[in-house]
């Protein structure tokens, strides 16, 4: 994962701040966090809640300053900054993490989870703990998973009910080889574009559609320019909340336990927010006149994913995790 020159220059100030901060003792400055979602989004509120709990339980000694809305760059950028200690904590989607750790391909597999409940039980259990632990060799401490809902396709051209309806469409995907392969297997043209640039790409016809969850579809105003939403629910990949190993190593054992405790408690808080947000977002996009196709037969989509699974699930550990998750259905 390497920053391009333009992005590197734009993020030089936060990086320098991070380097200077490393010389300070934990508690002399706020912990810094980042999120590409806007203030008020469930993941942002969950991380803020984590910070509030941490501050309350340390009488303000450990506190958090969170930077939402992509203020410090895209997720790939902020993940790299976190690895090098310029950020202390970070909420990112699994897509940029896929780039550095193949174990994280498992929960991002299309049609792996049969329901949100299945996903939550799997990630709260042993499979989730193994996946979080796989981040440690990369300079990251996996704290917890947050919901990212069910990703579905939406576009500006026509209703989609079958994979054939996607044929030839330019579909924005996250910068992940797995997502590229998934969309290509459906006969569409995958187009990696940073999250913050998708609205203009839809307006200008750079892409015809994208895939994301309902709250993101609403929150980004993508529904204004891409009114056809097909509820395929093809991916239920979670968000992951991480801490820099460099920050973790400077915490006392008691503070590490407290960080994990507060992160764990932020999960049900986030899920309650998420469930409410999904319902309200659905109502909003319907009121805006969008066409929601919720009775789609997903089996033809699922049938095309076998080669994608074969391409990305190649290690014994990945295969064991898939079996363990399927057994929890």
Residue ranges and their predicted role:
Residues 2-4, 12-18, 22-117, 127, ...:
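N-terminal secretory/targeting leader peptides
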């Amino acid at each position: 994962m390497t920053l391009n020159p333009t992005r590197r220059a734009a993020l030089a100030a936060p990086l320098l701040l991070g380097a200077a901060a490393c010389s300070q003792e934990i508690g002399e400055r706020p912990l810094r966090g980042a999120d590409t979602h806007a203030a008020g989004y469930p993941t942002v509120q969950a991380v803020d809640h984590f910070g509030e709990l941490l501050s309350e339980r340390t009488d303000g000694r450990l506190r958090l300053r969170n930077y939402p809305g992509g203020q410090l760059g895209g997720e790939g950028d902020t993940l790299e900054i976190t690895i090098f200690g310029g950020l202390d904590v970070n909420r990112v989607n699994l897509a940029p993490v896929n780039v550095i750790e193949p174990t994280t391909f498992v929960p991002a597999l299309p049609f792996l989870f049969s329901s949100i409940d299945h996903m939550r039980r799997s990630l709260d259990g042993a499979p989730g703990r193994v996946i979080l632990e796989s981040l440690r060799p990369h300079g990251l401490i996996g704290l917890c998973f947050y919901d990212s809902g069910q990703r579905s396709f939406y576009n500006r051209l026509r209703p989609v009910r079958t994979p054939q309806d996607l044929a030839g469409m330019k579909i924005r995907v996250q910068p992940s080889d797995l997502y590229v392969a998934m969309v290509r297997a459906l006969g569409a043209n995958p187009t990696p574009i940073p999250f913050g640039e998708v609205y203009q790409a839809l307006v200008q016809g750079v892409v015809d559609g994208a895939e994301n969850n309902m709250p993101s579809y609403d929150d980004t105003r993508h529904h204004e320019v891409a009114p056809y939403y097909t509820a395929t629910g093809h991916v239920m990949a979670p968000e992951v909340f991480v801490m820099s190993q460099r920050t973790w190593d400077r915490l006392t054992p008691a503070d590490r336990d407290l960080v994990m405790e507060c992160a764990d408690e932020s999960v049900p808080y986030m899920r309650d927010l998420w469930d409410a947000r999904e319902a309200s977002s659905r109502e909003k996009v319907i009121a805006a006149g969008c066409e929601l196709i919720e009775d789609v037969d997903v089996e033809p989509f699922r049938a095309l994913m076998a080669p994608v699974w074969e391409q990305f699930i190649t290690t014994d550990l990945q295969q064991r995790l898939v079996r363990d998750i399927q057994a929890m259905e």
